[in-house]
Every structure is written in structure tokens, then in C-alpha cells.
Amino acid sequence: KEENYFFKLSKYKDRIIEHIKKNPDFIQPEFRANEVLNQLEHIEDISVSRSKESVSWGIPVLGDDSQIIYVWIDALSNYITALGYDPETPSEMFKNYWPADVQVIGKDILKFHAIYWPAFLMALDIPLPKTILAHGWITIDQTKMSKSIGNVIAPKDVMETFELSHPDAFRYFMMVTAPTGRD
């Protein structure tokens, strides 16, 4: 156990549940929304920092050099900071592109994007993305593709084999052929 800063996630539980129920397209496919609703029933407040002793790198907590910002706070905030989010004077990019129409994510990080991220946005009074699309894993012989297992296919190799001139062609292929609801 260590001393950390916490975000009162429980304060936003009912609002997130209400948002999911009032916006049936918010989490797709629908069965993923049901998974999130089940997770919300048992949600607890979350630690948003880590001791500098346990994590040697990261963004320091302002005013407390003993703490580092939890990596998911940093990672999720990139969606809006990359667009120039500023509560005082939001950039034109932020005004034009937020809220996102669709955020495409893997099913293994659904909790972070469909529970934590909406709560953080609600706390800042920022609109939520319109849809979170959680895709399944890409598998080979019913096994998740994984660099650690060594069963991945490098996108660069696919592009060279099929003479694709731009990475967007490969991305498009994956979007239209990969199943969104299952592995």
C-alpha cells in the first residue's frame, strides 16, 4: 500500500449509467455496453497517482514531487490535448473535432474509455465522444495476436506483400474486414 491521490469515480457512476441508457449508440457493440453497465455496479474510486518510488518516470503531480500521474490519465487526456484543449480559450481544432464521432478501441481497454474517460470529461464539463466502438482481438488459430507470443504480422510486411502505397489503405482494410463484436 502507498499514499496516492484519488478521483471520486463513484460521484459520476449514475451519470455514466444514465448516459449509456439514454444513448444506445454510445458503446458499440451493444453487448459491450452491457459489460460496462455491469462493471459500473461495482465501481470504486480510482488512484490517479503513483508513488515516485514505485514508478520512476512519468508526469510529476503538480506541487507533490513524491507522486507521478497515473499513466491512463496522461494517455486519455491526449485525445483532447492533441486538439489544443484549453478551458479558457479552446483551439479551433478542439472546437471543430470534439466531441469525437467515434473512438475505436480494443475490448481490453474498454473500462478506461467507457468508464474512466467519461467520468474525467464529466468532471471537466466536456462533452463525451458520441460513440465508443470496442473491437475484438485479431487472432491466429484462436490465439490473440501478441508481440510477446511472437505470432504477430507486421503491417509493414502486409503493405509490401500487397503493394499498398499508404498506411491508410491497410487501416481501411482492417476496419472493414475485422469483426467488431468478436475475436
Sequence positions of predicted segments:
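Structured secondary-structure scaffolds
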Residues: 1-183
